[in-house]
A protein has these predicted regions:
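Active-site-proximal beta-strand/loop segments in catalytic clefts of secreted hydrolases
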Residues: 1, 17-21, 51-55, 113-117, ...
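Flexible loop/turn segments at secondary-structure boundaries
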Residues: 1-2, 22-26, 56-61, 119-121, ...
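Aromatic/acidic polysaccharide-binding cleft in carbohydrate-active enzymes
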Residues: 11-79, 88-96
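Solvent-exposed beta-hairpin/edge-strand motifs
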Residues: 127-146
């Protein structure tokens, strides 16, 4: 709130940096990171969420270079929400434990849906002021690391998609 009152009117941008979260390959310990990025972008109206990619056991990679699950969670936002994209209005919490943010840029629409529930959720998305016929999906979950998912076909500006338990799509 202080940012919106004092800095935003002056044209200042808000960037949020990560902080250490004790998490590893366990999806349940990673979900708070996805929720935090969602909150920073939606509630905090941040322009960027910065994760310092430093090779270290507490960072995004193990000492052997293997990516930790948290890297894939951050990638769900970073790979698809590119520089120059802007956040567009979306119902931030369309269901209990489901968090949605949407972005547009370069003629594309990106929706990031976080399902922190321990059960899959069938979620309907309705698009306004956009003409889209289908979405490519990418998922990170207990068993997937930014894996290509099924296509979501849009009919009459809406589509329903199953969000796996504890996943980012």
């Amino acid at each position: 709130p202080l940012f919106q009152q004092k800095a935003a009117p002056l044209g200042k941008k808000l960037w949020q940096t990560e902080h250490y979260v004790n998490s590893d390959a366990n999806i349940s310990t990673i979900m708070p990171i996805a929720k935090e990025i969602h909150d920073v972008m939606v509630t905090g109206s941040a322009n960027a969420y910065v994760y310092w990619w430093i090779p270290h056991a507490n960072g995004l990679t193990a000492n052997d270079g293997t990516l930790f699950k948290r890297a894939y969670v951050i990638g769900q936002f970073a790979k698809h929400v590119r520089p120059g994209y802007f956040r567009v209005e979306a119902t931030a919490t369309p269901a209990t434990n489901v968090y949605v943010s949407a972005y547009a840029g370069n003629g594309k629409v990106v929706i990031v849906a976080v399902n922190s529930s321990t059960a899959a959720v069938s979620q309907t998305f309705t698009l306004q002021n956009a003409t889209v016929s289908q979405f490519s999906t990418w998922q990170t979950s207990a068993s997937a690391n930014m894996a290509a998912g099924s296509e979501a076909s849009v009919s009459g500006n809406s589509f329903t998609f199953s969000l796996p338990a504890q996943s980012i799509t």
